[in-house]
Amino acid sequence: MAFKVVVSDTKTGKSYQFETESTALIGKKIGDEISGSVVELEGYKLKITGGSDKCGFAMRHDIHGAMKMRVLLKEGPGYNVKEKGLRRRKSLRGNTISKDVTLINTKVVEYGSAPLGGEPESTE
């Protein structure tokens, strides 16, 4: 099982995508801090901010566990309110990373010594 890990740089506003086969991410929750060495970013510390599963369902921080649920929402992640007071039942994934999750969103909390984007490409 491969995870796509999107790392957002809060200083520059850019994001970088990495792939990893690491099983160290399984069982982690939204809000947990992980080492950047999971995605070969030595010295970095990353905070998990969200993700989505293999069917495209978003993870939500207030649904505990790794299962998929149909919840009634009036606002927040996973639901875009069209009218005031409108509620809707949506399928969402829980806040724990499992083998069904394919995309993990993170942001940088502590920076390492190497630049995040690697070597800039030459424009020849």
Swiss-Prot record:
- Family per similarity comment: Belongs to the eukaryotic ribosomal protein eS6 family.
Q: Which InterPro entries does the UniProt entry name for this protein?
A: Ribosomal_eS6 (IPR001377), Ribosomal_eS6_arc (IPR020924)
By what name is this protein known? Small ribosomal subunit protein eS6
The reply to whether Repeat figures as a keyword in the UniProt entry is no
Q: Which GO terms describe its molecular function?
A: structural constituent of ribosome
Tell me the NCBIfam families matching this sequence. Answer: PRK04290.1-3
Q: Name one GO biological process term.
A: translation
List the coiled-coil residues.
none
Example of a GO cellular component annotation carried by this entry = ribosome
Per its UniProt record, what PANTHER family does this chain match?
40S RIBOSOMAL PROTEIN S6
Identify the keywords attached in UniProt to this record, alphabetized.
Ribonucleoprotein, Ribosomal protein
